[in-house]
């Protein structure tokens, strides 16, 4: 209590004046109403960004010092690394196919190939086909058997190739009302054998001119027709100008079999085709001459070819003058029409009124222009036009000599216009489209030659497991005499292939789904609808 009284007393005794500012009241008038608001805030980026301005100096400074390391151990030498190629898929050496079906007697294929080798390959291929059908009032049988043997040997300087081919075809179209009981007298048979050897040079030395040589000898129906062929291709560069020389010799011998009633005939011909290639104005030129010699005289034809790639790998144009030549033989006629008159070809024949086929050479020169255009990925279009004079243009004529109603060859000189188109497109990994068409126009009537031929197909591939290919074929009208024509033919076909595995697969082919039964040749009707089913096995 005493302390409190003392403290108050001291404060009263030591009072002093304190100076202070006298602040008067200020009047504030608000003329507008204040509306409080909060501004919108933008969202901040949750991911921080930064940039490093520090640069790493990658330069290095070093010096080389020579000294030996003293160690009490020895290092093991490393072996060189070995690079292995990808494993090659296994190949099967052999394949067997057999099938049969409606109006198809049998169809078979046997194939065998050697194992992979760098210097030796060989193989064999056999095919068999036969059918049987009964047109109204007739009976028809056909068969075709082929054998192909091949071998290829490769050494340091050359490639040697040898082939042996055998082709036997029979064709029977028998009138049921015929009084002849034995079919052999009405059956056409053509057995053809051909042996070929070729040598191809791998040397590119300037002093090596011969690039390849080919020799073959053939026989039809036991020396009823023989051909001996020898050809060579020589190349040489003269003053930086590539020169190519093709030499070809052919000897055709007919009716030389011992039982022939006709005198043997022989026709020899020799070809020389020198050509030079050069480039000018961005165009690739190939010029030359075709020199032909035979007993009828010497014929010379020009060869001019110009090739220009207007757009690299896209648009190619090719045009010029070309020579066409083909020797008509009994073999070529039989391939075109197996129902030709076959007198003197070593087979059973009725009657004594036979004749030899007139075998001539068809030749000519024509102007041509070809274009190839890549329209897009996996899409290509090709078109060509050609016009020229054809000497000895061959066409077949029906001749009924009392014993046989068959065909012989005839000739006419014509002016020919030929247009052709080809289109290929891979639409997807599953579907493709292929189409082609040929149109011909002649200034004279020719027999059994269509003006228009077309084909379109659409292969479907389902992962290589199932393959389907529908196709449509059209064959235009053909004159068989001066005023009459054979009707055009329209065929729809369907093929199916199911691959159960790489070893086993099944096949179904349906031909002529519209069951067209029109005449292929005058008085020779086509087979109509037919089909074949088969299986194949690889091992």
Where do the model's predicted regions map?
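Outer-membrane beta-barrel translocator/receptor signature
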Residues: 75-80, 87-96, 100-147
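Flexible loop and strand-edge segments within Gram-negative outer membrane beta-barrel domains
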Residues: 131-146, 163-208, 215-227
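Surface-exposed extracellular loop regions of Gram-negative outer-membrane beta-barrel proteins
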Residues: 114-133, 244-246, 261-292, 426-436, ...
């Amino acid at each position: 209590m005493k302390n409190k009284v003392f403290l108050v007393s001291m404060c009263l005794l030591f009072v002093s004046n304190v100076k202070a500012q006298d602040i008067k009241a200020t009047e504030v008038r608000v003329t507008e109403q204040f509306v409080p608001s909060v501004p919108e805030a933008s969202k901040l980026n949750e991911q921080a960004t930064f940039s490093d301005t520090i640069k790493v100096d990658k330069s290095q400074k070093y010096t080389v010092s020579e000294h030996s390391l003293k160690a009490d151990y020895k290092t093991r030498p490393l072996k060189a690394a070995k690079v292995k190629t990808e494993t090659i898929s296994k190949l099967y050496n052999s394949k067997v196919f057999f099938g049969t079906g409606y109006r198809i007697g049998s169809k078979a294929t046997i194939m065998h190939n050697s194992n992979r080798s760098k210097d030796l390959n060989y193989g064999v291929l056999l095919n068999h086909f036969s059918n049987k059908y009964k047109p109204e009032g007739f009976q028809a049988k056909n068969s075709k058997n082929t054998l192909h043997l091949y071998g290829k040997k490769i050494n340091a300087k050359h490639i040697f190739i040898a082939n042996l081919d055998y082709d036997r075809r029979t064709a029977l179209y028998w009138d049921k009302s015929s009084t002849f009981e034995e079919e052999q007298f009405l059956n056409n048979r053509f057995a053809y054998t051909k042996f070929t050897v070729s040598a191809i040079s791998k040397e590119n030395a300037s002093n090596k001119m011969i690039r390849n040589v080919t020799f073959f000898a053939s026989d039809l129906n036991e020396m009823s027709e023989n051909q001996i062929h020898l050809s060579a291709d020589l190349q040489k560069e003269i003053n930086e100008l590539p020169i190519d020389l093709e030499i070809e010799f052919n000897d055709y011998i007919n009716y030389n079999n011992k039982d022939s009633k006709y005198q043997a005939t022989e026709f020899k011909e020799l070809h020389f085709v020198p050509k030079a290639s050069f480039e000018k104005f961005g165009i690739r030129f190939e010029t030359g001459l075709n020199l032909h010699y035979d007993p009828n005289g010497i014929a010379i034809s020009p060869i001019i070819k110009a090739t220009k790639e207007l757009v690299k790998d896209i648009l190619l144009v090719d045009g010029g003058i070309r020579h066409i030549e083909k020797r008509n033989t009994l073999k070529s006629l039989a391939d075109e029409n197996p129902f030709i008159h076959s007198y003197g070809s070593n087979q059973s024949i009725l009657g004594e009124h036979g004749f030899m086929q007139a075998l001539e050479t068809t030749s000519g020169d024509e102007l041509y222009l070809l274009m190839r255009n890549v329209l897009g990925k996996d899409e290509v279009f090709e078109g060509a036009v050609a016009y020229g004079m054809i000497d000895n243009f061959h066409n077949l004529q029906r001749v009924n000599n009392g014993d046989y109603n068959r065909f012989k060859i005839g000739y006419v000189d014509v002016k020919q216009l030929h247009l052709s188109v080809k289109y290929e497109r891979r639409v997807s990994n599953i579907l493709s489209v292929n189409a082609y068409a040929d149109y011909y126009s002649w200034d004279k009537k020719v027999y059994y030659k269509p003006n228009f031929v077309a084909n379109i197909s659409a292969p479907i591939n389902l992962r290589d497991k199932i393959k389907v290919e529908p196709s449509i074929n059209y064959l235009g009208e053909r004159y068989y005499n001066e005023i009459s024509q054979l009707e055009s033919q329209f065929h729809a076909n369907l093929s199916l292939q199911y691959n159960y595995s790489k070893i086993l697969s099944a096949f179904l082919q349906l031909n002529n789904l519209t069951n067209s039964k029109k005449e292929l040749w005058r008085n020779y009707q086509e087979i109509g609808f037919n089909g074949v089913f088969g299986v194949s096995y690889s091992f």
